[in-house]
């Protein structure tokens, strides 16, 4: 574990949190997965498309889904709706402004590129303190 992640983990108390990663960029998805795992978060995915995310949802019930809003040219609004229907908190990540996200029910929006510190803050925002482990 990197010293940065170790220091954050000591304060994060996000152990056993289950997060679904939905990101079409292999590099971003793997970096995100590695960072989450360093924080002792259980990671499902990454999924590169809404269909892949749906298949993972059939197998697991994540607490939070981190979703890139634009997945290979397909906007993820329908997936976000389905995640909300299942009680999964959604964090949208995007490399550009997407005004339509304001119309979606999301716990938070994280602008790419983002730091480990920003990711941790967003996860804390997405999970109320009463539910943090």
Question: Each predicted region: which residue ranges?
Answer:
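Acidic, metal-coordinating helix/loop segments flanking the phosphotransfer/catalytic sites
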Residues: 46-64
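Hydrophobic/aromatic residues positioned on beta-strands within the core alpha/beta folds
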Residues: 93-94
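Conserved acidic carboxylate
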Residues: 23
């Amino acid at each position: 574990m990197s010293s940065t992640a170790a220091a954050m983990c000591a304060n994060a108390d996000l152990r056993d949190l289950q997060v679904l990663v939905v990101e079409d960029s292999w590099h971003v998805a793997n970096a995100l997965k590695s960072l989450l795992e360093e924080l002792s978060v259980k990671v499902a995915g990454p999924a590169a498309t809404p269909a892949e995310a749906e298949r993972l949802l059939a197998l697991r019930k994540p607490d939070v889904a981190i979703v890139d809003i634009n997945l290979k040219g397909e906007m993820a609004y329908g997936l976000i709706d389905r995640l909300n229907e299942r009680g999964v908190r959604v964090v949208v990540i995007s490399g550009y402004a997407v005004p339509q996200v304001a119309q979606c029910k999301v716990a938070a929006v994280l602008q790419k590129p983002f730091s480990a510190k920003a990711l941790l803050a967003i996860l804390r925002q997405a999970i109320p303190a009463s539910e943090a482990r």
